[in-house]
């Protein structure tokens, strides 16, 4: 209507008294809407969940959406509440209960309570895997961190691959040789190899 957008329900009722410049699809009971160059989120009752309009809003995943304001990043929950008092230089979606955040060129993880997982910030960080581990890089070496913020291995590696979900091993490179570690960070073999492939099944 007059280049404005809204939603209509199965009874033919217009969802919101507010008309928008653009609207997105509903996801997890919420939809992104835009007005005057800024974004917000509307629920199935036609209510905006936040009093704050943002420069950008991403889709909800695991109960949180990434929001951008003045070049900084945060998260909102399904009630429109900010997850953290800290705004970050970068933020990624929640996966397996944690989201990667970036601050001052370093990476860490944030949980659904808004707590930073580790006192140590990292040069690089990968998303948590279903096994409950995330790959992190510090000073050109790699390790695994668990959901308690503890390093899985006493060793730091030249490279770490993803955990194999069936066998529970991750491919690693240490001092130029290849090996595997288990979920406790222990090497599978006492010797290193010139090359090692991932586990295969027949």
Predicted feature residues:
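Residue-level detector of conserved, function-critical positions
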Residues: 1-202
């Amino acid at each position: 209507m007059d280049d404005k957008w809204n939603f209509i329900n199965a009874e033919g009722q217009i969802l919101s008294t507010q008309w928008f410049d653009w609207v997105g699809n509903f996801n997890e009971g919420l939809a992104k809407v835009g007005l005057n160059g800024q974004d917000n989120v509307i629920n199935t009752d036609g209510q905006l969940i936040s009093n704050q309009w943002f420069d950008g809003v991403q889709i909800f995943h695991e109960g949180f959406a990434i929001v951008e304001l003045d070049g900084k990043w945060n998260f909102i929950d399904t009630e429109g509440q900010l997850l953290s008092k800290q705004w970050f230089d970068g933020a990624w979606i929640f996966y397996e209960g944690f989201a990667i955040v970036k601050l001052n060129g370093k990476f860490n993880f944030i949980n659904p309570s808004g707590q930073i997982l580790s006192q140590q910030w990292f040069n690089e960080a990968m998303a948590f895997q279903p096994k409950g581990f995330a790959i992190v890089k510090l000073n050109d070496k790699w390790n695994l961190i668990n959901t308690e913020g503890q390093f899985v291995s006493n060793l730091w590696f030249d490279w770490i691959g993803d955990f194999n979900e069936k066998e529970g091993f991750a491919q690693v490179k240490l001092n130029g040789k290849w090996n595997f570690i288990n979920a406790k960070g222990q090497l599978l073999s006492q010797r290193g190899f010139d090359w090692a492939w991932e586990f295969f099944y027949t």
